[in-house]
Amino acid sequence: TMRDVLEIARAFATQDPDGNGKNDTYGLGVNKGLIAENNLPYAVLDGFFNSYHAYPSIWITDEDGKLAYGGIQPEMKDALADLQKLYAEGVIDPEFGVKDAVKVSENVNAGKVGMFYGYFWNCSSGWLQDGKMNDPSIDWIAVPILSIDDEPAKAMVPFATTYYTVVSMDCANPEAAVKMYNLVLEKMFGETAQPEVYNSTPENLAVFN
């Protein structure tokens, strides 16, 4: 259960996992953005909150079947209370408020973080692989989000579509928007792609607009 996760985090912080005689390992890695919406989704707390059935950055259906903002629901208080305890006990880096995802990853790769929440790509090169190269004995495992009670935890999943192109019904040639997209995709990724012209500068710097 989530209670086990909390105790494991405490164990990382208090039982000297690297054997250097110091309590210098943090049980739970946290970056200053706190949730994925505010920073790179590495060492963010979305999964932590979801274990308490709390959803800090999305709209949910409340008990009355109405739309309600997840960040102000009662479940948030329980999650925040346990986070406060972890922070007070030294399980969370006291300087997390000034460390972004990259900075936290440096601690992770140095073997100074026991666990963290993140996305699937967090195991890629640089985010976790550097630590494995430095210390082959490091062994990371992926664990499903666990619930604080008997109700299964549900993860916040970003909606697949993030941008829309809208054309006025009064537009004389609405199909031009589709043609423009087709041209961009063709010149960047199609059979006649010219990435050196459309996807990078003469200095070979990537261009994304």
Can you describe what each PLM-predicted range is?
Residues 1-209:
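Extracytoplasmic/secretory soluble proteins
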